[in-house]
């Protein structure tokens, strides 16, 4: 009897479950604000309507405020959901509002975009 196939299947399942067990959440609260897995501050944009499923920040706006991108297989978790952008890519949303990074933030914990033009805010 060939024992390779069951062994290979067992190994594959073990690796899959190990990966799931160590998966990090897409974002978490740290220092009183929402940050991504790298510790970079996440922001919301006042022109985005909560629950609309759309981002109003595209083109040049998205160059300065990069969307917090979600993987194709990303699943909602808690207050985090996923919206589909105009270009078909997926973006994380917090309480229904798309979330973004700020290009001028250079290291984890930076929050230099808070209240930028009175329309960008850190997520608290």
Where are these regions (language model features)?
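Bacterial N-terminal signal peptides
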Residues: 10-18
């Amino acid at each position: 009897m060939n024992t390779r196939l069951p062994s290979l299947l067992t190994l594959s399942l073990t690796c899959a479950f190990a990966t799931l067990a160590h998966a990090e959440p897409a974002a978490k609260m740290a220092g009183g604000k929402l940050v991504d897995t790298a510790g970079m501050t996440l922001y919301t944009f006042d022109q985005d309507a909560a629950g609309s499923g759309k981002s109003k920040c595209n083109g040049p706006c998205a160059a300065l405020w990069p969307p917090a991108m979600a993987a194709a297989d990303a699943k909602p978790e808690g207050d985090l959901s996923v919206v589909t952008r105009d270009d078909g890519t997926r973006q994380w949303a917090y309480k229904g509002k798309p979330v973004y990074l700020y290009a001028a933030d250079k290291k984890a914990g930076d929050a230099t975009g808070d209240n930028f033009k009175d329309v960008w805010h850190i997520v608290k």
